[in-house]
C-alpha cells in the first residue's frame, strides 16, 4: 500500500554550477547548428575547469558554423551566466574545440531511405512523469528547489540590493513533508551559494537569500519548525569550474523530476532531437502531463523504449499509481494512437528541430512555461481533448 505521510527531498543547481555551465555550452552548440540547418545531427560534450573549456563530439551540419563562431557563442554564454573571476572568466578562458563528423555507421541506421522511416539514434528507455501537486504538474520538491535558484539568479543578474554580492554557482535542496499524499510544508531548506564578498559568513548570506526563499515557497510552508542550512561550510568564494571540474550530462535527476520518478539514464544536453534520450523523454513528459491535465489521474508515469535504427517504440508502459480513472492497458494503446511516437513523429509534433535548447540547460527541462517560439512545447496540454475523446 502506498504511503501517504512521508518526507521527500530534491535538489537543484544553478546555471553557474560547473556541470550546468557545460550543459549550457553543449546546448548552445546544438542551437547554433539547428539555427543554420534544422536537420543537423549533434552529440556534443563539454568539460570546464579553471579558465579552460573543452568542447568535443560528433556533428553533421553546415560549414557556415565555424569553430570561431562557436567560441564566440561559448564566451557569450559564460558571460551571461556571470563568470568574470580570475579563475574562470568569459574573456580569458581558453576554449578548445574538437568536433568531427558523425559516424557513418550510426547515420545509416538513423537516416530515412526508400520505404524505411527515420530510426531512433540509439537504444534506450525514457520516462515521463506528472503529478497534480503543483500548478506545473511537477513534484513539489524539485519544482520549488528550481524556483529558489531561478529567483536568486534573476535578482543577482539584475543587481537587486545585496543579491549583487552573490556569485553564479549555487545549489538548493528542499525537504517536503507530505500529509495524506499532499505536500504541506518544507521541513528542511539547504542553500549553498557562491558569494563575491569574502567577508560574508553564513548568517550574512542567509540575510540575503532568506527573503527570496520565503517568497518562492507557498506561504504556509516555512514556519518555526523549518530547519535552515545556508552555506553550512561558512565560506563559498571559489566556485564554478574554478572550484570543481564540470562535465555535460551529470545532472540528469536535477534536469527531470528530482528523484520522484524513474530515469532511463540518458542525459539531454548536447543532443539533437533524433536522439531519443532527449526527444522521447520530452514526449513521455508531454503525454504524462496531458493525462493528468485531462483529469484521468492525479499521477502518471510513462515509459517508452527504443532500438537504434528502429522507428517505432518497442514498448509503451503506463503507471497511474492507483490514482487513475481509466484502465492503464487501454491508455497505453490510446497514447500510441493519438501521438506518432517515432523519432520523426515526435520531432514534427513538438517542433523540436529549432534552436530552443540552451534555455533548457538550467532550472529543469520540465515544469516550464511553453514559449511563443516553440520552446518547451512538450509542456503544452493540447492533447487533453483528444485523450478524453479517445477514451470516451
From Swiss-Prot:
UniProt record similarity statement: Belongs to the AdoMet synthase family.
Name of the protein in question: S-adenosylmethionine synthase
CC cofactor note: Binds 2 divalent ions per subunit.
UniProt: K(+) binding residues: 45
Matching PROSITE patterns: ADOMET_SYNTHASE_1, ADOMET_SYNTHASE_2
GO function terms (MF aspect): ATP binding; magnesium ion binding; methionine adenosyltransferase activity
EC class: transferase
Residues binding Mg(2+): 19
Catalytic activity: L-methionine + ATP + H2O = S-adenosyl-L-methionine + phosphate + diphosphate
Assembly with partners or alone: Homotetramer; dimer of dimers.
UniProt cofactor(s): Mg(2+); K(+)
UniProt key word Nucleotide-binding: yes
Alphabetical keyword list: ATP-binding, Cytoplasm, Magnesium, Metal-binding, Nucleotide-binding, One-carbon metabolism, Potassium, Transferase
Species lineage: Bacteria, Pseudomonadati, Pseudomonadota, Alphaproteobacteria, Hyphomicrobiales
Pathway(s) of this molecule: Amino-acid biosynthesis; S-adenosyl-L-methionine biosynthesis; S-adenosyl-L-methionine from L-methionine: step 1/1
Subcellular location: Cytoplasm
Amino acid at each position: 500500500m502506498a504511503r501517504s505521510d512521508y518526507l521527500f527531498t530534491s535538489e537543484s543547481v544553478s546555471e553557474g554550477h560547473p556541470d550546468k555551465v557545460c550543459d549550457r555550452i553543449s546546448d548552445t552548440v546544438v542551437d547554433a547548428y539547428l539555427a543554420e540547418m534544422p536537420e543537423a545531427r549533434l552529440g556534443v560534450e563539454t568539460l570546464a575547469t579553471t579558465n579552460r573549456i573543452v568542447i568535443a563530439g560528433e556533428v553533421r551540419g553546415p560549414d557556415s558554423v565555424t569553430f570561431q563562431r562557436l567560441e564566440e557563442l561559448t564566451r557569450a554564454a559564460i558571460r551571461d551566466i556571470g563568470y568574470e573571476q580570475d579563475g574562470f572568466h568569459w574573456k580569458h578562458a581558453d576554449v578548445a574545440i574538437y568536433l568531427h563528423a558523425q559516424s557513418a555507421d550510426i547515420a545509416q541506421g538513423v537516416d530515412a531511405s526508400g520505404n524505411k522511416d527515420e530510426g531512433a539514434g540509439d537504444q534506450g528507455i525514457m520516462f515521463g512523469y506528472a503529478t497534480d501537486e503543483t500548478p506545473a504538474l511537477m513534484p513539489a520538491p524539485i519544482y520549488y528547489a528550481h524556483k529558489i535558484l531561478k529567483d536568486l539568479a534573476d535578482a543577482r543578474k539584475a543587481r537587486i540590493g545585496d543579491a549583487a554580492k552573490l556569485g553564479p554557482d549555487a545549489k538548493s535542496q528542499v525537504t517536503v513533508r507530505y500529509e495524506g499524499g499532499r505536500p504541506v510544508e518544507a521541513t528542511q531548506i539547504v542553500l549553498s551559494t557562491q558569494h563575491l564578498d569574502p567577508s560574508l559568513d553564513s548568517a550574512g548570506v542567509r540575510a540575503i537569500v532568506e527573503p527570496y526563499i520565503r517568497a518562492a515557497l507557498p506561504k504556509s510552508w516555512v514556519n518555526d519548525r523549518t530547519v535552515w542550512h545556508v552555506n553550512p561550510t561558512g565560506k563559498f568564494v571559489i566556485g564554478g569550474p574554478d572550484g570543481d571540474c564540470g562535465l555535460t550530462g551529470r545532472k540528469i535527476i536535477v534536469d527531470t523530476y528530482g528523484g520522484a520518478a524513474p530515469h532511463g539514464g540518458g542525459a539531454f544536453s548536447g543532443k539533437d532531437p533524433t536522439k531519443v534520450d532527449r526527444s522521447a523523454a520530452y514526449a513521455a513528459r508531454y503525454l504524462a502531463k496531458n493525462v493528468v491535465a485531462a483529469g484521468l489521474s492525479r499521477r502518471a508515469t510513462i515509459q517508452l523504449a527504443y532500438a537504434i535504427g528502429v522507428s517505432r517504440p518497442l514498448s509503451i508502459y503506463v503507471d497511474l499509481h492507483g490514482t487513475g480513472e481509466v484502465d492503464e492497458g487501454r491508455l497505453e494503446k490510446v497514447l500510441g494512437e493519438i501521438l506518432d511516437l517515432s523519432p520523426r513523429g515526435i520531432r514534427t509534433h513538438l517542433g523540436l528541430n529549432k534552436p530552443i535548447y540552451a534555455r533548457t540547460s538550467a532550472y529543469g527541462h520540465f515544469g516550464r512555461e511553453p514559449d511563443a517560439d516553440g520552446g518547451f512545447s512538450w509542456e503544452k496540454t493540447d492533447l487533453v481533448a483528444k485523450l478524453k475523446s479517445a477514451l470516451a
